[in-house]
C-alpha cells in the first residue's frame, strides 16, 4: 500500500541512499498529523452505522426514484436498502483507512481502481454515492485538524466518483 512515507522509503532504498532531510521532515510532519488522522478514524468508525443510515436517507431524499426501482441492486426492498447502507459503509471505511495511513493509498488500491466497472456492472449511479459522501462530510461532527484530515479523503472519494 502506497503512502507518502512508504514512497519516500522505497525511492531512497531503490537508489541506495538514506532519506533526504526533506523526506525526514515530511515524516515528522506526518507523525504530527497522525494524531488528527487517528482521531478522525476513531470518530468515523464509532459513527459509521448512523452516518451510513443517514447518508442512505439523504440519497433517497435526493433521488426518490431509487426506492421504487426493482431489482437486486435497488432500494425497493429491504435487501436493497441494506446493500445501500453496506456500500456507503464501505466508503466510510475507506476514508478511515486513509486517515490512519495518512494518504490515499487504501482508496486508490481498493476503491478507485475498480469503481467505474463496479458501478457499470451493477447499474449503480456514482451520483448516489457522491450525495452520500456529502452527507457524511456535513454530519460527521468532526472539527479542527481531524475534520480537515477526514474531509480531504471524503473530497478525494467524491472527485474519484465525479
From Swiss-Prot:
- Kindly indicate whether the keyword Cytoplasm belongs to this entry: no
Gene Ontology CC terms, in alphabetical order: phycobilisome; plasma membrane-derived thylakoid membrane
Chief subcellular location: membrane
Family annotation (InterPro entries): Globin-like_sf (IPR009050), Phycobilisome_asu/bsu (IPR012128), Phycobilisome_asu/bsu_sf (IPR038719), Phycocyanin_a (IPR006246)
On whether Transport is a keyword of this UniProt record, the answer is yes
What keyword terms does UniProt attach to this protein?
Antenna complex, Bile pigment, Chromophore, Electron transport, Membrane, Photosynthesis, Phycobilisome, Thylakoid, Transport
User: Which Gene3D superfamilies does this UniProt record tie to the protein?
Assistant: Phycocyanins (1.10.490.20)
Gene Ontology biological process terms from the UniProt entry: photosynthesis
Q: What Pfam families does the record tag this protein with? A: Phycobilisome
Which of this chain's residues are annotated to bind (2R,3E)-phycocyanobilin? Answer: 84
Task: Give the subcellular location.
Answer: Cellular thylakoid membrane
State the membrane topology.
Answer: Peripheral membrane protein
Its post-translational modification remark reads: Contains one covalently linked bilin chromophore.
Stated role: Light-harvesting photosynthetic bile pigment-protein from the phycobiliprotein complex (phycobilisome, PBS). Phycocyanin is the major phycobiliprotein in the PBS rod.
The entry assigns this protein to a family as follows: Belongs to the phycobiliprotein family.
Q: Which PANTHER family match?
A: C-PHYCOCYANIN ALPHA SUBUNIT, PHYCOBILISOME 32.1 KDA LINKER POLYPEPTIDE, PHYCOCYANIN-ASSOCIATED, ROD 2-RELATED
Give the multimer and partner information. Answer: Heterodimer of an alpha and a beta subunit, which further assembles into trimers and the trimers into hexamers.
Q: What is this protein called?
A: C-phycocyanin-1 alpha subunit
Q: Which organism is it from?
A: Pseudanabaena tenuis (strain PCC 7409)
Amino acid at each position: 500500500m502506497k503512502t507518502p512515507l512508504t514512497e519516500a522509503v522505497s525511492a531512497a532504498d531503490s537508489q541506495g541512499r538514506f532519506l533526504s532531510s526533506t523526506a525526514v521532515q515530511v515524516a515528522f510532519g506526518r507523525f504530527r498529523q497522525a494524531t488528527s488522522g487517528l482521531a478522525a478514524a476513531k470518530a468515523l468508525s464509532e459513527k459509521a452505522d448512523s452516518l451510513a443510515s443517514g447518508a442512505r436517507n439523504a440519497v433517497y431524499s435526493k433521488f426518490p426514484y431509487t426506492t421504487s426501482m426493482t431489482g437486486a441492486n435497488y432500494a425497493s426492498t429491504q435487501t436493497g436498502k441494506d446493500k445501500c447502507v453496506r456500500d456507503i459503509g464501505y466508503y466510510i471505511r475507506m476514508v478511515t483507512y486513509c486517515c490512519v495511513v495518512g494518504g490515499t493509498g487504501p482508496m486508490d488500491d481498493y476503491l478507485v481502481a475498480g469503481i467505474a466497472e463496479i458501478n457499470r456492472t451493477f447499474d449503480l449511479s456514482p451520483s448516489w454515492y457522491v450525495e452520500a459522501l456529502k452527507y457524511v462530510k456535513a454530519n460527521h461532527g468532526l472539527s479542527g485538524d481531524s475534520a480537515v484530515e477526514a474531509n480531504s479523503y471524503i473530497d478525494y472519494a467524491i472527485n474519484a466518483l465525479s
